Amino acid sequence: MQIKAFLGGYDKNLSYLIWCEATRIAGIIDASIEITEILECIDSNNLLLEKVFITHTHFDHIKYLDDLTDQFPYLQICGYKNSEEKFTDNYRELDHHEIITLGTEMITVLHTPGHYPDSVCFWNKKGNFVFTGDTMFVGRTGRTIGPKSNNSCLYSSIYDELLKLPQQTVIYPGHHYGYKKSVTLKENISLSPFFQCNSEDEFIRVMEDYEETRRN
């Protein structure tokens, strides 16, 4: 699978155009970037855009979804089954560990609540990469300051799901907040105390300490 990252949006957002090399069928991870450059890439690579994958429904990750569906009315919108947002008749409700096809490629859905209840990550086992939205960034997790956020859920999502993936899995996050756009899980663990905790209580302390630094 090929991956092209696009940086912009509300706050260093990252959208990704992905496609199956064998079929030229493409998808977009998060509609968070103004679409002109993405459309140019679709045209220049002779791609057929089939799906948009939504990592969660915070406004900045779906801001340009209407622009995409205006251009491609047949688009299938793929998001978590219990999301409060239902975008179009083409909305596909995803379940935990469901497998989606994109051409000949297979993508596994991982429900990863914590930052937001409908957060999901999209893992391609063959390519050894995962799109983590706002669940995991380079160097830290997503924040849990919203009324629907939950530290305990985020701990489970990180330690029982993402950190159980192969250590050489490359993460592609929803924002460019780190020293580079993507790293392996192994590297992320080595550089961040968020991913070195031995218990949920320790993880929550790390989260609270981080928020304290934001206030100072």
Predicted regions and their residues:
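Divalent metal-coordination and catalytic microenvironments
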Residues: 18, 30, 56, 68, ...
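Pocket-forming structural segment of enzyme catalytic cores
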Residues: 98-99, 104-123, 140
